[in-house]
């Protein structure tokens, strides 16, 4: 699943390519991928000029003058910016026809991704964005006390809590493993047992890892690969996720499922 750094990489490429172009038509081949009524969505997106792209957490925001189209890639979503002779395969579910003659194709093998339109006045006050937690790449001074209350209000493993997008936006399975390793926190620890100092470390390490991963254009492993000519390199800097040995103490890393998600950690370095 693309996490914040991968979505930011997509945003940067699409912002460069699409800004100033109009969406002239839309082919929707799998209607369930559109959260809105189809006619409402088309009426509010067709003939709109893309003035830029923004992002909040894992949500891409295609900005128009009077509103925005939101896209969430979920597990397998990918965009292809292509010429009109591009071969349309069965996994391409939405095709945007652009004013320069090119196509923006959305491919999603799992069909989990979603699109919707929101007016400017409701963009951040209605779902999905109203439910998104703090984005540490945009907020350099988050309220630690508020985050501490949200986290310690839960008794589930801290790994599972940090995957909740209403707390820290953009963290997914890969980066939660890395953040907890750098913070010396066992992913099985109950969330209500973390200290406010632990939360501060989680925030600091999330910021650091997000920024480094963005500089390296994200992590390219398993199903997340580039569809826009950009290959991520951060997989070369991962400390524990998919690894077998702790880089610090050289112990064999633990590989176990927590909340249904494969998790990697060092039981000696993480308490």
Walk through the language-model features, giving the residues of each.
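A cross-family signal for N-terminal binding/gating loops and helix N-caps
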Residues: 1-107, 112-114, 245-248, 261-271
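Catalytic cores of large soluble enzymes that bind and process phosphate-bearing ligands
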Residues: 2, 6, 139, 198
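Basic, nucleic-acid-binding surfaces and adjacent catalytic neighborhoods in DNA/RNA-processing proteins
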Residues: 22-41, 54, 59, 70, ...
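Phosphate/anion-contacting hairpin/loop surfaces
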Residues: 65, 69-170, 175-182, 190
């Amino acid at each position: 699943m693309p996490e914040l750094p991968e979505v930011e990489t997509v945003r940067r490429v699409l912002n460069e390519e699409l800004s100033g172009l109009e969406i002239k038509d839309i082919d929707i081949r799998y209607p369930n991928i559109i959260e809105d009524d189809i006619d409402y969505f088309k009426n509010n997106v067709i003939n709109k000029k893309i003035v830029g792209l923004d992002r909040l957490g894992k949500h891409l925001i295609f900005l128009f003058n009077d509103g925005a189209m939101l896209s969430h890639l979920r597990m397998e979503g990918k965009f292809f910016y292509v010429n009109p002779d591009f071969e349309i395969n069965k996994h391409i579910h939405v095709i945007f026809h652009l004013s320069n003659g090119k196509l923006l194709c959305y491919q999603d093998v799992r069909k989990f991704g979603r699109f919707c339109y929101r007016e400017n006045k409701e963009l951040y006050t209605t779902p999905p964005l109203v439910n998104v937690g703090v984005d540490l790449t945009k907020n350099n001074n988050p309220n630690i006390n508020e985050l501490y209350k949200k986290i310690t209000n839960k008794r589930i493993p801290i790994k599972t809590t940090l995957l909740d997008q209403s707390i820290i936006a953009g963290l997914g399975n890969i980066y939660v493993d890395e953040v907890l390793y750098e913070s010396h926190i066992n992913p099985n620890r109950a969330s209500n047992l973390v200290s406010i100092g632990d939360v501060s470390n989680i925030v600091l390490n999330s910021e650091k890892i997000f920024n480094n991963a963005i500089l390296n254009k994200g992590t390219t492993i398993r199903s997340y690969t580039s569809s826009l000519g950009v290959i991520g390199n951060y997989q070369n800097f991962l400390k524990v996720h998919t690894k077998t040995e702790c880089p610090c103490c050289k112990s064999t890393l633990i590989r176990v499922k927590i909340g249904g998600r494969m998790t990697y950690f060092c039981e000696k370095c993480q308490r």
